[in-house]
Each structure stands twice: as C-alpha cells, then as structure tokens.
Amino acid sequence: MSVRMLTAPLILLVIGVAARAADPGDAAAGKAYFSQTCMQCHTADPAEGGGEIGPSLVGLYGRTAGVGDDRFAYSAALKGSKLVWTQETLDHFLTDPATAVPGTTMAVPVPMKADRDNLIAYFRSLSSGTK
C-alpha cells in the first residue's frame, strides 16, 4: 500500500475527531434534560410564547443575550451584558448564572459539565432547525 493511500483516511479521521471535539454534547440528551428541568420556566417550541417564567429559547445559540423573545422582559443585567450565546458563553453562564451576569433573573445553575454540553448541543439544534 502506498503512503498516499494511507494518508487520506488518516486525514479524514483527524478532521472527524477535531469536528467532534468542537461540538461536544448530545442534542437528544440535552432535549431530555431540558424537558425535565428547564421547561418549568422556558419553552423551546416556536409555536409557543415564552415559558411560565423565562423566555423561549428557540434560536438562542448565536444570538445576543437579552434579545430574541419580544414577549419577555429581560433583566437590565442580561441586556447590558453584550454576550453572544456561544459554546463558551453558554457554558460559563449555565455553570453559575448569578456570577456570570450579576443581576440576571436566571437563578438555576447546571452544575454538571456533561449536562451543560448536552443542553448547548440541543440549543444549537434549535438554532439550526434540526431537533
């Protein structure tokens, strides 16, 4: 076998591993966690308005914090944070919302890293249209 024939599959393997590392989490597990924990306050259904207490999280990933659901009055702290919801900012915020954005009304942390990664994967799927 030639070196060229071995190199191409190796490159594809490395690219696949790198892509997986860039997108941690399992969207299906995140949806299950969301249903059990987050739906007490939020919704992720575009046909519904916000949740009972918090805003709809449809389209959250990639959006600026404090905007997106016109039916919800976001806190001045969240609106003033200028955060854009990415893997990193969501992970930091969900770890301890009150520390990440002092004055936010979001009070429930997600302490387990795997749960945060799964939730963020679910939020990404809601933003990309694949649930």
What are these regions (language model features)?
Residues M1-A8:
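Bacterial N-terminal signal peptides that target proteins for export
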